[in-house]
């Protein structure tokens, strides 16, 4: 049977459920599919397949559903470690998150950790589902839990006072036992997600950026740089900058080709060769980027949120300490960097996630939210994301 065509007539948004173990993330995911998609039972979602992202194995379940306003792709992870890995590697991009918190327990350690991770990896918006409200008889207690969640969100720089909090029971929705806290709450939740989580800007509408993968010299024509356009559009005749590794320089794109055909422009997702004016074959190298002038700056020092692989995942067998010097693989190239651990952290064990400061030996074109792999001699030992730029 032919797959049904993916209708592109609605904006597409990627979201996911986050929160403490056993607070009902997977049950809620199942309940949403019941009313807005093709129903997936708890067991189907819980048996999440393994996938690889940046050399790291992660279990993630993907479901899709739609509201009258939008089409959603939704991720749910079976284990806490999968959440950490998922959010840091960006295996499943999140434009927003549904924080699930049990009304019976209130915020727990992983509730806090997932909110911190969401802040560090730049999840733009969170909506809260206060689950299991049927287990709380006292209305004042319910209010107290809501207040606690709002304060926790505010403490991590999310707008805790404005974030929608919907109270309900995923189980009631799945069992059709109480319409008010079941179906009605799920519908109210999705209305809040529609309204509160902003539609992401499409890559094509962002400023042009192409990581350089290769450089060729074509006799009689000049220098061609190749790569996959990450975002935006480049038109023949436009001025671009070459950023990273060496001092930033300007050039003009005098030709764009794809599959040996000449084009008048290249856009996000295209694998292109760009002919650049006045650049010698050795004036540009893999690991630099072509970009819209002034849109990206080179940096050496940044704060990163990183996950360090366990021995079982093919990572290090031993901890590392301050002054650890691995390679950081950004886009197309490895750059050596020096790691400084935060005060009070003696060492980092395989399997940890940690905030560290990194100083690269050469500057790389970077912005917040840029992801990287941590490698030792070509072997991946961790993954990370630029949380903030220091200099």
From Swiss-Prot:
InterPro entries per the UniProt record, alphabetical: EF-Tu_GTP-bd, EF-Tu_GTPase, EFTu-like_2, EFTU_2, G_TR_CS, P-loop_NTPase, Small_GTP-bd, T_Tr_GTP-bd_dom
Mind listing the GO molecular function terms for this protein?
GTP binding; GTPase activity; guanosine tetraphosphate binding; translation elongation factor activity
Q: Which GO terms describe its cellular component?
A: cytosol
Alphabetically sorted, this entry's keywords are:
Cytoplasm, Elongation factor, GTP-binding, Hydrolase, Magnesium, Metal-binding, Nucleotide-binding, Protein biosynthesis
What residues bind GTP, as annotated?
A: 19-26, 76-80, 131-134
Tell me the segments the record calls region G1. Answer: 19-26
Report residue spans for region: G5.
169-171
Note down the stretches annotated as region G3.
76-79
Give its localization. Cytoplasm
Oligomeric form and interacting partners? Monomer.
The UniProt function text for this chain reads: GTP hydrolase that promotes the GTP-dependent binding of aminoacyl-tRNA to the A-site of ribosomes during protein biosynthesis.
What is the designated name of this protein? Elongation factor Tu
Q: Which organism is it from?
A: Agrobacterium fabrum (strain C58 / ATCC 33970) (Agrobacterium tumefaciens (strain C58))
């Amino acid at each position: 049977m032919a797959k049904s065509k993916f209708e592109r007539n609605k904006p597409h948004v990627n979201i996911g459920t986050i929160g403490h173990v056993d607070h009902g993330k997977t049950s809620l995911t199942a309940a949403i599919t019941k009313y807005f998609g093709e129903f997936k039972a708890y067991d189907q979602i819980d048996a999440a397949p393994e996938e690889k992202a940046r050399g790291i194995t992660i279990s993630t379940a993907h479901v899709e559903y739609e509201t009258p306003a939008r089409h959603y792709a939704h991720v749910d992870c079976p284990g806490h470690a999968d959440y950490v890995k998922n959010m840091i590697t960006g295996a499943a991009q999140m434009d927003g998150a549904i924080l699930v918190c049990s009304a019976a327990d209130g915020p727990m350690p992983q509730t806090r950790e997932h909110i911190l991770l969401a802040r560090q990896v730049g999840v733009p918006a969170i909506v809260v589902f206060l689950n299991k409200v049927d287990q709380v008889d006292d209305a004042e207690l319910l209010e107290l839990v809501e207040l606690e969640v709002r304060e926790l969100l505010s403490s991590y720089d999310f707008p805790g006072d404005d974030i929608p909090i919907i109270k309900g029971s995923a189980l009631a929705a799945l069992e059709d036992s109480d319409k008010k806290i079941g179906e009605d709450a799920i519908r109210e939740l999705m209305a809040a997600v529609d309204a509160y989580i902003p539609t992401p800007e499409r890559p094509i509408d962002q400023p042009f950026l192409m990581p350089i993968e290769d450089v060729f010299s074509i006799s009689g024509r000049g220098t061609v740089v190749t790569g996959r356009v990450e975002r935006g559009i480049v038109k023949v005749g436009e001025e671009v900058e070459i950023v990273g590794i060496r001092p930033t320089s300007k050039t003009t794109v005098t030709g764009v080709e794809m599959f040996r055909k000449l084009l008048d422009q290249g856009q996000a997702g295209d694998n292109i060769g760009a002919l650049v004016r006045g650049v010698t074959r050795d004036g540009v190298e893999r690991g630099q980027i072509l970009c819209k002038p002034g849109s990206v700056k080179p940096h050496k020092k940044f704060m990163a949120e990183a996950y360090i692989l366990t021995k079982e995942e093919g990572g290090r067998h031993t901890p590392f300490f301050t002054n650890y010097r691995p390679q950081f693989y950004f886009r197309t190239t490895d750059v050596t960097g020096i790691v400084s651990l935060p005060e009070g952290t003696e060492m980092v064990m395989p399997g940890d996630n940690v905030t560290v400061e990194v100083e690269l030996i050469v500057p790389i074109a970077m912005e917040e939210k840029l992801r990287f792999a941590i490698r030792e001699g070509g072997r991946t030992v961790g993954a990370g994301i630029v949380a903030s730029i220091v200099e």
